[in-house]
Structures are given as C-alpha cells and as structure tokens.
Amino acid sequence: SDLQIAVTKVVDSLARQLIADAEGHSKIISITTVNAKSERDAVEIGRACARNNLLKCALHGEDPNWGRILAAIGTTNAVLDPHNIDVTLNGVKVCEASSPGQSRDLVNMKSELIEIVIDLHIGSAMATIWTNDLTADYVHENSAYAT
C-alpha cells in the first residue's frame, strides 16, 4: 500500500541517519540479502554480517573480503545452498556460486558507502540491514572513559 511504502521510506531514512551519526565510523554499510526463502532468513543473514567484527574490520581496511561474508552467513540458521551464494560489493560480483567471481581489484572500496548484495537463489524474500565499520576511533571513543 502507499502508506506502507511511505513508512518504509521514512524508517529507511532514519536508519541511514543513525548510522551516519555513529561515533568513529568511516564507512556506512548497506547489506541487502535477496532471493531468500523468507524475510526472516534475509534479516538473519544481514544481521549476522552486520555484527561480524572481522567483516567490519575488513571493510574499514577497504578489503573486499567476500570470504568473511560467507563465513558470517554460515553462522545463521537460514535456509540456503552453501554452494550457490553470490556476493556483490559496490556493484562487482566478487563471489559467484560460492566461488571467486570478478576480480576483487575492481571493487571501489574508497567511498564512504559500501553496498553488499547477497543473493541466495532460493526464494523471493529480501531485507536490507544498515551498519558501519569498526575503527580504532570507535574502540577509543568507547573505551577511553570510566563508567
């Protein structure tokens, strides 16, 4: 419905603003899971990636490490075929059918926005999760004070 579309746009905008205001970040990361069996699976995969400190550190270091994305996906209970997952980073399909795809060197990791698309090829559900990278500034800001 029109109302649902309007509310979704507002909520998405608010989520982006929260991420952009996060202390010590250098990257804003969009993780979209498509063709999942259910929206629940798509959200679970996005959240697993968003919470993965190794992935967040790699993205801060501008390393398009799709293996860390697959590793995060592997921690979920989502329905998937582990041999048929595609990962696209900033428009470059670096992983196709869970194997190396296009060259990682083609991925522009310099921009503040990093867009990850995970294609499960198993259904029609999708979800987008927003997060940011893990930086030394973030660690410092959150460890340099007494509570």
What label would you give each PLM region?
Residues S1-A6, A78-P82:
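Unusually extended, aromatic-enriched hydrophobic runs near protein termini
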Residues D2-D41, I45:
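Oxyanion-binding "anion nests"
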Residues A15, N35, V43-R47, R51-T147:
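Internal helix-turn-beta structural module
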